């Protein structure tokens, strides 16, 4: 199908308001495409961007989240809330086990976390806890890569065998803090009914706004390519099972070795196979021209010798591959 040429954006302006905040303007779009693409990109940015978050923690001396630690101003619940606010990024791996150990009076921050050269703490000044004189805080923090928001109660089902004292955290993986879009009017030459799309994106520093919208656009293109190609894996279609038919019924009536008279009478009634014959009743056969009681008795005796009778019912007769037009006249009377 041929279609008219659609306008594509020729002007893309990126205004960096801050390292974490950008306003991206794209124009022109055909009328209505601003809302169509803006809403799709916004939903992908908010729900499908990969990021990193603390998912599990073990604190020395803590058995459950409602415990309290001597020498620490915050209770465990507050410490866990502060851990969720840590923004970090792993390079070349998808999960890591980090350690945080500090003692003595002072403030514990995200910058005190140790995890190796491939762990980048985006907000090292983020406060985790405050220690008083003689206070001590030791913990291990598991960080994982993921998408969206995953409550700890959901992850708990898959961690039934976790160690005593291990606390699962609600994980917010999305590196995008806020996304909004607006559609304004655009003009190209004499056309004034076009759209200008303005997207306002703010991230937490794991990705910059430009990288985020590129990733979202890539996801959208990959998803829509399925519709463009109409390719995929079709659902398996279960083939209907053909009913089993006794091979004897598929044999021609000539195999019954009837007299020539009886055989010709049957063929005159389009009875070519044994399966055709056993479905006829005695009354029906006696109506056949030139077939009398003697021939009928002969047919009944031959069928009985094979464990068959007249008047039987076959639900799946005739089979689709049966040649009903087959006629064998080798025994026909001259």
Curated annotation (Swiss-Prot):
Region annotation Alpha C-terminal domain (alpha-CTD): where it falls in the sequence: 245-334
Enzyme class of the recorded protein, top EC level: transferase
Cellular component annotations (GO), alphabetically ordered: cytoplasm; DNA-directed RNA polymerase complex
Region (Alpha N-terminal domain (alpha-NTD)): 1-231
The entry's keywords: DNA-directed RNA polymerase, Nucleotidyltransferase, Transcription, Transferase
Family label: Belongs to the RNA polymerase alpha chain family.
Protein purpose: DNA-dependent RNA polymerase catalyzes the transcription of DNA into RNA using the four ribonucleoside triphosphates as substrates.
NCBIfam families membership: PRK05182.1-2 (NF003513), PRK05182.2-5 (NF003519), rpoA (TIGR02027)
Quaternary structure annotation from Swiss-Prot or TrEMBL: Homodimer. The RNAP catalytic core consists of 2 alpha, 1 beta, 1 beta' and 1 omega subunit. When a sigma factor is associated with the core the holoenzyme is formed, which can initiate transcription.
Protein name as annotated: DNA-directed RNA polymerase subunit alpha
Gene field: rpoA
């Amino acid at each position: 199908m041929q279609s008219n040429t659609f306008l594509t954006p020729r002007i893309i302006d990126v205004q960096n308001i801050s390292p974490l905040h950008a306003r991206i303007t794209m124009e022109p779009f055909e009328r209505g495409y601003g809302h169509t693409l803006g809403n799709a990109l916004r939903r992908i940015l908010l729900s499908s961007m990969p990021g990193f978050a603390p998912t599990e923690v073990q604190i020395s001396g803590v058995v459950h989240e409602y415990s309290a630690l001597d020498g620490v101003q915050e209770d465990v619940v507050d410490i866990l809330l502060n851990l969720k606010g840590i923004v970090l990024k792993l390079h070349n791996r998808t999960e890591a086990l980090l350690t945080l150990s500090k003692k003595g009076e002072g403030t514990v921050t995200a910058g005190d976390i140790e995890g190796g050269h491939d762990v980048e703490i985006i907000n090292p000044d983020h406060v985790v806890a405050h220690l008083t004189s003689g206070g001590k805080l030791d913990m291990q923090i598991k960080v994982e890569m993921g998408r969206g928001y995953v409550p700890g109660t959901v992850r708990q089902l898959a961690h039934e065998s976790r160690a005593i004292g291990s606390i699962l955290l609600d994980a917010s993986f999305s590196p995008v803090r806020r996304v909004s879009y607006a559609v304004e009017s655009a003009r190209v030459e004499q056309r004034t009914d076009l759209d200008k799309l303005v997207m306002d994106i703010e991230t937490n520093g794991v990705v910059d706004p430009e990288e985020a919208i590129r990733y979202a656009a890539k996801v959208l293109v990959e998803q829509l390519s399925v519709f463009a190609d109409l390719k995929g894996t079709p659902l398996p279609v279960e083939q209907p099972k053909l009913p089993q038919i006794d091979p004897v019924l598929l044999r021609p009536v000539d195999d019954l070795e009837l007299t020539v008279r009886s055989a010709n009478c049957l063929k005159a009634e389009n009875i070519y196979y044994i399966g055709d014959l056993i479905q006829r009743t005695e009354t029906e056969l006696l109506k056949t021209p030139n077939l009398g009681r003697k021939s009928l008795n002969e047919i009944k005796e031959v069928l009985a010798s094979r464990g068959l009778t007249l008047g039987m019912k076959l639900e799946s007769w005739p089979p689709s591959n049966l040649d009903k037009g087959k006629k064998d006249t080798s025994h026909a009377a001259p």
